[in-house]
Amino acid sequence: MATYFVGDIQGCLDELLLLLDQVSFDKEKDQLWLTGDLVARGPKSLETLRFVKSLDKAAVTILGNHDLHLLAVSQGISRIKEKDKTASIFTAPDSEELLTWLRHQPLLATHAQHNIVMTHAGISPQWNIETATECAREIESVLVSDKWVWLLENMYENQPDLWQSDLTGINRYRYIINAFTRMRFCYPDGRLDMECKQPPQELSSDDKEKLIPWFDLKSRCPLSHTVIFGHWAALMGYENNGVIALDTGCVWGEYMTMYRVDDGQYFTQKAIS
């Protein structure tokens, strides 16, 4: 049995299938862990949802910002973004089944054997693994309750940007969602920056003083697990300091990256979509 982690798919199903062919993936004995954002700008978002769902227990996926946006669009809360290719999902005969399945996916998944946690964007620098897990479970419980539409209606804001354990209600939920699905840079005091998407090396000298990748923040809570995440395509992959970034911009014409945790080997597939 082998365990593979793969970066954001975003509807680039053909590249994912080629990666799985590279390693002779067998869903009867192997596992595929996906860092979220199954859908969005690639050509096969509908087919990607169907494929990952069909893997059943051979796949573990988590929610990314594009997945949550898809759910919001399904309820008329938001509109399909100009470059997204997700319209076919809403007219598919299995649309409701797929969207319900997606809504029941977690924000954080733990691989106990390999001491790994997987989230879409990372772990808030104020959280240890226990707090992160508790926060993820809070949001997951709302998403499967009758308050899930209310949650999606109120998630589209950047505040609060600093974690406090006494946050309550939608402010608490919004921070948790932003940290798990949108975070890239933080300010030195730990506040989340929700605007900058550049790679760290391209920041101006002034910005480098005030914008720090969440995983490089000196005051970051020590973590007991390796963190595997996607989301930040501009990093073009990263492994250091107890974190592994796997989104390498396939949907932007770069390539898709998969990591076999058992032996630390990486596999890549150039974008063809």
From Swiss-Prot:
It comes from the Bacteria. Keywords: Hydrolase. It catalyses: P(1),P(4)-bis(5'-adenosyl) tetraphosphate + H2O = 2 ADP + 2 H(+). CDD domains: MPP_ApaH. SUPFAM superfamilies: Metallo-dependent phosphatases. It is an enzyme of class 3 (hydrolase). One of its GO terms (molecular function) is bis(5'-nucleosyl)-tetraphosphatase (symmetrical) activity. Its EC number is 3.6.1.41. Belongs to the Ap4A hydrolase family. PANTHER family: CYTOCHROME C5, PTHR40942. HAMAP family: ApaH. Hydrolyzes diadenosine 5',5'''-P1,P4-tetraphosphate to yield ADP. This is Bis(5'-nucleosyl)-tetraphosphatase, symmetrical. It comes from Aliivibrio salmonicida (strain LFI1238) (Vibrio salmonicida (strain LFI1238)). The lineage of its organism: Bacteria, Pseudomonadati, Pseudomonadota, Gammaproteobacteria, Vibrionales. The gene is apaH.
